[in-house]
Amino acid sequence: RLTLNVISSDFPGEQADSAYRYRRSWEVVEILKQAWTQDEINYDGEIYKLKGLSTDPVRPYQINGGPLLYFGGYSPDALALCGAHCDTYLMWPEPKDMLAQRMRDVHAQAEKHGRLLDYGLRVHMIVRDTEQEAREYADELVSKLDDAAGAAIRNRALDAKSLGVSLQSANRDRADEDGYVEPNLWTGVGRARSGCGAALVGSVDQVMSKIDDYMKMGIRSFIFSGYPHLQECEIFGTKVLPQLKTVSLPHAYGRVPSTTPATPLGVGKRK
């Protein structure tokens, strides 16, 4: 049931350089892997030094590596860490040719360690019966947004100065006058939030076709959302989700318990 996403951001009140933050993430991931696979943690890193620390009770029921690790980042340090230690490289929306290059770059890092990665995409959704309805809703969503207020919202985020966020901003700069950086990929949602700054906008068939294109590229992990959350969840869950091919990556990797966990969720009575 559990997968983990590693984010190498500053802590609140902290301003650390990129190299330090990725070094810290690297060490944390290596420590976690010891915690999930060994009886003791013994680690002598640049930042963390631990000796004889018992891993009880954090060891999971999995006996083959622990939960899957998702990771996002665009700098050389980020790609090196993902290639060495993580399972799924998680991307924000960009034109497909740019996504393909991201995948090639991190694949080259994973190859150095004899590893293969999965790929994921985090993207917002606006899906309606027709493209016109979807585009009209997208326009309505930001129709009352003041650009200065949107900039203030983005700048409050801890990741406001990150490379990934700057690349999302570049998408908006490349977009056409309606905010589309490629067919059905709308950057307007990024005017009012940091992080993932684009949405798939279109009819059910158009959105399904776009997702299918991503799958053919090798992306098989998706994180979808929409605004307002409940409304868009119901629309997507009714119109798109039943048509999607699904896969459980923990099962695909064999990263599941060998026995049913003796926990209330594992053996408790279902109502």
Where are these regions (language model features)?
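An alpha-helical appendage that flanks or caps ligand/catalytic pockets
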Residues: S18-Q62, E94-K216, K245-K271
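Alpha-helical segments flanking ligand/cofactor-binding loops in enzyme cores
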Residues: L79-G83, D212
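Structural motif
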Residues: A84-H85, M217
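Hydrophobic faces of well-ordered beta-strands that scaffold small-molecule active sites
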Residues: L2-V6, L69-G72, D87-M91, L117-H124, ...
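Long, low-complexity C-terminal extensions of enzymes
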Residues: D205-M208, M217, S221-F222, Y227, ...
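Active-site beta-loop-alpha junctions enriched in small/polar residues
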Residues: I7-F11, Y74-P76, E94, R122-R128, ...
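Glycine-rich, proline-tolerant flexible connector loops at the mouths of alpha/beta enzymes
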Residues: D10-P12, P93-K96, F224-G237
